[in-house]
Amino acid sequence: MARRPRSSRAWHFVLSAARRDADARAVALAGTANWGYDSDGQHSDSDSDPECASLPSSIPSAVPVTGESFCDCDSQSEAFCGSLHTAHRGRDCRCGEEDEYFDWVWDDLNKSSATLLSCDNRKVSFHMEYSCGTAAIRGTKELGEGQHFWEIKMTSPVYGTDMMVGIGTSDVDLDKYHHTFCSLLGRDEDSWGLSYTGLLHHKGDKTSFSSRFGQGSIIGVHLDTWHGTLTFFKNRKCIGVAATQLQNKRFYPMVCSTAAKSSMKVIRSCASVTSLQYLCCFRLRQLRPGSGDTLEGLPLPPGLKQVLHHKLGWVLSMSRQPPAPSPAANGPEPRRCQRKRCRRT
């Protein structure tokens, strides 16, 4: 029988839910009777089948998301090289990584066993060889009163059962699903998670929230404990308010992944009190949404401009207008902009 091409086999296995791997590792381990393979680059046995396996995925999980990068670097536009689970290892893209001070980094003491930290604990890598479940990690700082903003950059191909960015309380068990492929963030009332498929998860429910994101995408998160809102950004443009009524609650920034050899990096983490200065900068950005430099042309002392850029640069640079919906054939349709406008009352 003629051998089917690799790309054809991958699509066939995804659509038929066959549990096989397209990597060469499958050949080396094919003699092991009790193991199977799936599209996350995972070894899978009877206790590591994905929950909700009967539910259709919004995009084929074996195929990495492309075309959603913040920049046009070659290393971001080239997804996989050689096989579904061998990432293109070109020069690391540093676009969007201007910050030098970070309010928090990833916590080496509160993470799943299948994680590895690097870059001064700002970059987390998941499932270094293969995956047998879901790995997660949280930040070093519990976020309480004030304004909190951070950005996570997808530094590897994005694929698999799920890769998520979100928040959760101290009650979230990060290692609970280390033998289960699932969307960990948002499975209960203690966490919210935005999936790379564009689905928002909370209390076990899924809501179509945005277009998908992939390698090179920058996902921003704004936790406003004054107004009690959680807002997500994609490539520094607002995509919507995900949660409200979060006043007087404390959360940790969290990410999770089921994909083998996947990674994410904190490129910005900052905090501010909800002061008159913050509210003024926020209002200025609303009044000048299309300006590259919100303070440009304003009659302010140079020293004050420098202080504001240093302390509240993220407020002055973010686009608060949600993007217009685009007819994406392979992704969930975003909700109407009118229902997701980032405004304060």
Swiss-Prot record:
SUPFAM superfamilies: Concanavalin A-like lectins/glucanases. Residues 84-273 form the B30.2/SPRY domain. The keyword Nucleus applies. Pathway: Protein modification; protein ubiquitination. Residues 38-58, 320-345 are annotated as: Disordered. One of its GO terms (molecular function) is ubiquitin-like ligase-substrate adaptor activity. Disulfide bonds: none annotated. GO terms for cellular component: Cul5-RING ubiquitin ligase complex; nucleus; SCF ubiquitin ligase complex. Keywords: Nucleus, Ubl conjugation pathway. It is found in: Nucleus. InterPro entries: B30.2/SPRY, B30.2/SPRY_sf, ConA-like_dom_sf, FBXO45-Fsn/SPSB_families, SOCS_box, SPRY_dom, SPRY_SPSB3. PROSITE patterns: B302_SPRY (PS50188), SOCS (PS50225). Substrate-recognition component of the ECS(SPSB3) complex, composed of SPSB3, CUL5, ELOB, ELOC and RNF7/RBX2. Interacts with MET. Belongs to the SPSB family. Substrate-recognition component of a cullin-5-RING E3 ubiquitin-protein ligase complex (ECS complex, also named CRL5 complex), which mediates the ubiquitination and subsequent proteasomal degradation of target proteins, such as CGAS and SNAI1. The ECS(SPSB3) complex catalyzes 'Lys-48'-linked ubiquitination of nuclear CGAS in cycling cells, leading to its degradation. Recognizes and binds nucleosome-bound CGAS: ubiquitination and degradation of nuclear CGAS during G1 and G2 phases is required to promote low intranuclear CGAS abundance before the next mitotic cycle. The SOCS box domain mediates the interaction with the Elongin BC complex, an adapter module in different E3 ubiquitin ligase complexes. This is SPRY domain-containing SOCS box protein 3. It comes from Bos taurus (Bovine).
